[in-house]
Amino acid sequence: MAIVKCKPTSPGRRFVVKVVNKELHKGAPHAPLIEKKSKSGGRNNNGRITTRHVGGGHKQHYRLVDFRRNDKDGIPATVERIEYDPNRTAHIALLCYADGERRYIIAPKGVSAGDQLIAGALAPIKAGNSLQLRNIPVGSTVHGIELKPGKGAQIARSAGASAQLIAREGVYVTLRLRSGEMRKVLAECRATLGEVSNSEHSLRSLGKAGAKRWRGVRPTVRGVAMNPVDHPHGGGEGRTSGGRHPVSPWGFPTKGAKTRGNKRTDNMIVRRRK
């Protein structure tokens, strides 16, 4: 994987920084594992905008990714290829199991075409293998972690993400997340060894506003540029700073205000994130 800085042959290419991976599959995705993906333009069934800054963008197909891997225990799989997925920052890997079935998984870092992967309690400690947390050694790096047994991976799924298993006590294990948070998870939950691929994703630069539009992201208008009817920061004579602590268009504090409200699982968090 290489970081390529484009030559400034035009204003739109002057600031472009690409992440080039020559191992990525250049053809179409595996047809049985794709589904139609409709665009909402950020509107709900009443046609009203419920999510701002959404609309347009290139047409995409959704890739059906296996986040559970619990019904293929003990069946070895070969990595056929690594693919780009427009629906996520990580790359995906197409596995061909010994029984002939093919499935997509989140591609772990260091896994390439031809590698052998397996899931289950007897799987060796190797990047890309999926085990229950009770069977993973303390100190290991993991990703694709379940919060409820059998529900599928929910933690550490984006490019370069991972967590470290730092303790095992009774029916729980303790994980240290990239955010600095330490939390307990049931040892029955599954995780995949290693970290997620495409860790260089954060080093790229789109270079121009149009590249953001290709991805279906519309412009964000500053509150201080609006009228008072549209935003709490709006109005004023000339250019103003808003005159109050930063808030959302609905008056809720923004820029760092804590929004977590799930008291039911507070006891699972050993240390809050930084």
Curated annotation (Swiss-Prot):
GO terms classed as biological process: cytoplasmic translation
The keyword Ribosomal protein is assigned to this record: yes
UniProt keyword rRNA-binding present: yes
GO CC terms in record: large ribosomal subunit
Domain of life: Bacteria
InterPro entries: NA-bd_OB-fold, Rib_uL2_dom2, Ribosomal_uL2, Ribosomal_uL2_bac/org-type, Ribosomal_uL2_C, Ribosomal_uL2_CS, Ribosomal_uL2_dom3, Ribosomal_uL2_RNA-bd_dom
GO MF, one example: structural constituent of ribosome
Record key words, sorted: Ribonucleoprotein, Ribosomal protein, RNA-binding, rRNA-binding
Matching Gene3D superfamilies: 2.30.30.30, Nucleic acid-binding proteins (2.40.50.140), Ribosomal protein L2, domain 3 (4.10.950.10)
Region described as Disordered: 28-55, 224-274
PANTHER family: LARGE RIBOSOMAL SUBUNIT PROTEIN UL2M (PTHR13691:SF5), RIBOSOMAL PROTEIN L2 (PTHR13691)
Subunit note: Part of the 50S ribosomal subunit. Forms a bridge to the 30S subunit in the 70S ribosome.
Family, per entry: Belongs to the universal ribosomal protein uL2 family.
Functional note: One of the primary rRNA binding proteins. Required for association of the 30S and 50S subunits to form the 70S ribosome, for tRNA binding and peptide bond formation. It has been suggested to have peptidyltransferase activity; this is somewhat controversial. Makes several contacts with the 16S rRNA in the 70S ribosome.
Protein name: Large ribosomal subunit protein uL2
The encoding gene: rplB
